[in-house]
Amino acid sequence: MMSALFCDATHELDAIGLRCPEPVMMVRKKVRLMADGETLLVSADDPSTTRDIPSFCRFMDHTLVASETEQAPYRYLIRKGQ
């Protein structure tokens, strides 16, 4: 079941079927076009995203608002900026 948080995302990115490094590259490209405070819901099934997306958020100073990583497809809600 998808958390209500995920339903309110400003933007969505479907990275299902893509493998490292493609999902994070797509996230970076999409976030660059967003305004500060907007959110991005990312869906992915590459296990490396469970490590790479949180690292991307820390490194680029974005906020990982929520994540569901118990089983694929994984979901991440990223807020641009802090």
From Swiss-Prot:
Main subcellular localisation: cytoplasm
Pfam family, one: TusA
Organism whose genome encodes this protein: Aeromonas hydrophila subsp. hydrophila (strain ATCC 7966 / DSM 30187 / BCRC 13018 / CCUG 14551 / JCM 1027 / KCTC 2358 / NCIMB 9240 / NCTC 8049)
UniProt xrefs under CDD domains: SirA (cd03423)
Keywords of the record: Cytoplasm
Protein's UniProt name: Sulfur carrier protein TusA
Recorded GO MF terms: sulfur carrier activity
GO CC aspect terms: cytoplasm
Compartments reported by the entry: Cytoplasm
Top-level taxon: Bacteria
Cytoplasm recorded as keyword: yes
Function: Sulfur carrier protein which probably makes part of a sulfur-relay system.
PANTHER family in the cross-refs: SULFUR CARRIER PROTEIN TUSA (PTHR33279:SF2), SULFUR CARRIER PROTEIN YEDF-RELATED (PTHR33279)
Biological processes per GO annotation: tRNA wobble position uridine thiolation
Family to which this protein belongs: Belongs to the sulfur carrier protein TusA family.
